[in-house]
UniProtKB/Swiss-Prot annotation:
Subcellular location: Secreted
Domain of life: Eukaryota
KW Hydrolase (keyword) present: no
GO CC field: extracellular region
Pfam family, one: Hormone_2
Chloroplast among keywords: no
Name of the featured protein: Vasoactive intestinal peptide
Species per Swiss-Prot/TrEMBL record: Gadus morhua
A GO MF label: neuropeptide hormone activity
Similarity section: Belongs to the glucagon family.
Amino acid sequence: HSDAVFTDNYSRFRKQMAAKKYLNS
């Protein structure tokens, strides 16, 4: 199901953004 794939990719993307913010701070 495309929605499930999108949600999985989006959550992974959010984690990466959070990790970058954490490392840059």
